[in-house]
């Protein structure tokens, strides 16, 4: 028996089965134990192979590919700590819904817990975070090809949200052997190899709790009431649909930076602090929230405190998604589908004064930031930097809060982020995956600590298939902690942790373009030139450390003093 050859037969069938469920992209890290999987991936013409030397970044690369393609994406890593490095991306996928298939090569059972090199207990390593887990046996011809392909088909049919962990033990040898051996084992599947469908076509009907197909019977009653719409994270087309739907109802729409609604009432994080705006919103009889992962502090505070007669939350992801635990309805359904089943009725807007508060807040922002070249000013004017027919990736921490509070992105413009666990790890890798999946011009904006955290992902950005700009806002540390009541004496050393770096040499190391503009006109011109010439350019904007946080706090205070608007 040639173990190496049968390992490869087994792996080839495994990967072919995954392609029948829509897997096109596969991300591969170097390793010996994963050789059967790697060689099978390289030989499969249906797969696009991506490589990276850092498994943590590799997992986030796959996450970005899955976000932008909305398809399942596979990952191959070797045994040992390489597997554990996938944990952050797996956690994020579980919270935001991207489908990742983690193929983790493993030592065979007899090499576990006996001191063998690079052998750890991989089964169950990820605890409850994967949606599904499959622990495959050591490959052997005694196990039929039908069993393997049926097992994979069943798991993939159940995977609607989050990650699937497939642990794959392989015994040595891993190389060499007569490639013609065990052809009969593969051939036992007959003409399936020439087909394009799964071997086992399993249909999974969701439980009744998740079955939103019937229209809410009392919708025709509630659509005549005073309603408020909250828009969280959703797709571009859903954002456009929701904006038109809410406008027809005459209901105010408070849109998150990730809602892609165009934020018809911009600067909500500011004007929601105004007492009169809160009084107006308190008159709402029903609140409908579409999507989750809200960014704005003031919106979250209002969302927690509001007490409408009904609170409905619509999102395709499972789970409650409401930290405030409102009494109401949790409808697990795609936003677009729900809107089409619940038509709007044209009604006169009931909260017109909110538009006045929004306009006043926006005017205050423009006046305060006039002539500045600052973190807040870049966030406010970010829409001017976006490429035509492109996309935006927004990092976490302070920058996304500033864009949400001070900016206004175009309706339907694709925006991506990692706002499930909201970590700063893997952001550059995720942005690289988003760009590769779509081949669109991409603007990614992150802070300096986020860039440092994932610095070796600059290697992934060398391979952009369309112009890409990585905008690093260097405020010298984690200045989001300047927004929090952290102890002032310990703030810099233990929270902000300034690193006093610039990124010019990092860009040179990875053969990227680099610029460090000193004014808004320079920044705008640099970015415009990047869209024309292609490749990836790292543009660093150095700003005073705490200015962005201080500006946001100042604007919140100023907006609360806006004169009352007559209803």
From Swiss-Prot:
A GO BP entry: menaquinone biosynthetic process
Keyword Heme listed: no
Keywords: Magnesium, Manganese, Menaquinone biosynthesis, Metal-binding, Thiamine pyrophosphate, Transferase
Cofactor binding mode and count: Binds 1 thiamine pyrophosphate per subunit.
Cystine crosslinks: none
Superkingdom: Bacteria
Transmembrane segments: none
Top EC class of this enzyme: transferase
Pathway: Quinol/quinone metabolism; 1,4-dihydroxy-2-naphthoate biosynthesis; 1,4-dihydroxy-2-naphthoate from chorismate: step 2/7; Quinol/quinone metabolism; menaquinone biosynthesis
Catalytically driven reaction(s): isochorismate + 2-oxoglutarate + H(+) = 5-enolpyruvoyl-6-hydroxy-2-succinyl-cyclohex-3-ene-1-carboxylate + CO2
One term of GO molecular function: magnesium ion binding
Keyword Magnesium: yes
Swiss-Prot/TrEMBL cofactor(s): Mg(2+); Mn(2+); thiamine diphosphate
Gene3D superfamilies membership: 3.40.50.970, TPP-binding domain
Entry's EC annotation: 2.2.1.9
Protein role: Catalyzes the thiamine diphosphate-dependent decarboxylation of 2-oxoglutarate and the subsequent addition of the resulting succinic semialdehyde-thiamine pyrophosphate anion to isochorismate to yield 2-succinyl-5-enolpyruvyl-6-hydroxy-3-cyclohexene-1-carboxylate (SEPHCHC).
Subunit comment: Homodimer.
Family indicated by similarity: Belongs to the TPP enzyme family. MenD subfamily.
HAMAP family per UniProt: MenD (MF_01659)
Protein name (record): 2-succinyl-5-enolpyruvyl-6-hydroxy-3-cyclohexene-1-carboxylate synthase
Taxonomic source organism: Yersinia pseudotuberculosis serotype O:1b (strain IP 31758)
